[in-house]
């Protein structure tokens, strides 16, 4: 007698079709990056713009963020997976006090040679390297994030190139529309006014903390790439990068049709604002770079990004939250961190409030498009 047929059981053809759709979804970002790069090549050739990248700057900054990402991922891992990461490490140091002494001396050396933030990062990375060695983690396992990292690097270079190309051929500026929307949201006030008043009255420690929160986003993205790739698998890391790049695609398309720039670009008294010096210099550098682009100066494409609406600085952490949602403690910590980040984005005059709302929408679309076909994979131990 034949066994009963389960009407709800997936057939081989349906399984194969789902697998194909999943693969297409997973590599959608790669297809997008390749398509954008082809459009970039054709567009720059048509307009006689030399395609020249500052590769050394890209590599240097990517390496710095990569090191910071390792430190960030170790902190998140210790918080979100204490029994797997923190407890065994604590036991090892308790059983071998000499190890703690050596680590203390190494930390003292780092803090003597480098600024406090850099020293802390190097110390955390050193701890991570020692832990990987002690646990005997296979080299092949440690290479899981490599392909997603290369994928992200190529995608970001393409995005920066496309952004530079767009501001070269389009001089339109619809920021006044976004500013008007902001005036309704802020009851007649503006993002620049809010930023200047806050920075004039807040202690330097607060504005510095907000600045660190803003720039730390890049390490947060790298940490998510590392955690998803190492704990879930390389394919999950690739899916994360695809989602980020898809969000950038939406942003680039909006910017091509509706170019907007951050509030400091049109702020009359921006030079007098009491923003942190690093923030002022970064914003002034972008304004200078934009002027050169719009005057068709022959300068290499660097890590320059001009898009105000929608705000990718809020879209990306939301995507990170989605991919790290299975670790509740990490999620809780990042919700607090990203709430501070959202405040920093406006209070340091990087974006309009309306830009943040656009960023939330872009993140939602990118997540739905890139993850709705994929079954969630359970995390595993790192071996």
Regions found by a protein language model. Give the residues of each.
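Alpha-helical transmembrane segments
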Residues: 26-42, 95-106, 151-155
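Juxtamembrane "helix-exit" motif on the non-cytosolic side of transmembrane helices
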Residues: 42-55, 82-83, 106-115, 136
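Intramembrane catalytic core of multi-pass membrane enzymes that act on lipidic substrates
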Residues: 125-213
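Interfacial segments of alpha-helical transmembrane regions
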Residues: 144-153, 222-259, 263-272
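Membrane-interface loop-to-helix entry segments
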Residues: 205-220, 304-325, 353, 357
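Membrane-interfacial alpha-helical segments at the cytosolic side of multi-pass membrane proteins
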Residues: 224-228, 314-331, 361-372
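Membrane-interfacial catalytic/cofactor-binding modules of polytopic membrane enzymes
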Residues: 254-327
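Interfacial helix-loop-helix junctions of multi-pass membrane proteins
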Residues: 262-263, 308, 340-365
């Amino acid at each position: 007698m034949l066994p009963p047929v389960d009407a709800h059981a997936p057939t081989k053809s349906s399984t194969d079709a789902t697998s194909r759709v999943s693969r297409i979804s997973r590599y959608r970002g790669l297809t997008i990056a390749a398509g954008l790069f082809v459009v970039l090549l054709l567009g720059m050739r048509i307009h006689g713009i030399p395609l020249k990248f500052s590769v050394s700057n890209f590599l240097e900054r990517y390496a710095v963020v990569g090191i910071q990402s390792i430190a960030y991922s170790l902190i998140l891992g210790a918080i979100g997976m204490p029994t797997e990461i923190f407890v065994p490490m604590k036991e090892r140091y308790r059983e071998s006090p000499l190890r703690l002494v050596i680590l203390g001396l190494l930390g003292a050396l780092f803090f003597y040679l480098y600024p406090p933030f850099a020293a802390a990062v190097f110390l955390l990375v050193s701890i991570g390297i020692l832990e990987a060695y002690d646990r005997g983690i296979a080299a092949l396992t440690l290479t899981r994030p490599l392909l997603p990292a290369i994928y992200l690097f190529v995608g970001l270079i393409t995005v920066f190139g496309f952004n530079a190309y767009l501001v070269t051929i389009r001089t339109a500026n619809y920021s006044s529309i976004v500013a008007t929307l902001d005036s309704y949201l802020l009851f007649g006030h503006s993002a620049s006014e809010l930023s200047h008043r806050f920075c004039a009255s807040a202690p330097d420690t607060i504005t510095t903390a907000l600045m660190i929160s803003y720039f730390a986003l890049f390490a947060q993205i790298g940490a998510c790439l590392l955690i998803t790739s190492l704990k879930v698998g390389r394919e999950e890391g690739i899916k994360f990068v695809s989602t980020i790049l898809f969000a950038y695609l939406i942003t680039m398309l909006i910017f091509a049709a509706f170019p907007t720039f951050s509030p400091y670009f049109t702020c009359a008294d921006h030079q007098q604002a009491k923003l942190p010096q690093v923030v002022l210099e970064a914003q002034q550098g972008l304004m200078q770079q934009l002027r050169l682009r719009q005057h068709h100066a022959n300068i290499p494409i660097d890590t320059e990004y001009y898009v105000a609406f929608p705000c990718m600085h809020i879209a990306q952490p939301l995507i990170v939250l989605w991919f790290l949602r299975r670790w509740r403690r990490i999620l809780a910590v990042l919700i607090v961190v990203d709430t501070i980040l959202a405040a920093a984005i406006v209070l340091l005059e990087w974006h309009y409030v309306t830009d943040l709302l656009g960023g939330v929408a872009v993140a939602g679309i990118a997540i739905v498009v890139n993850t709705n076909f994929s079954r969630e994979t359970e995390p595993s131990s790192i071996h």
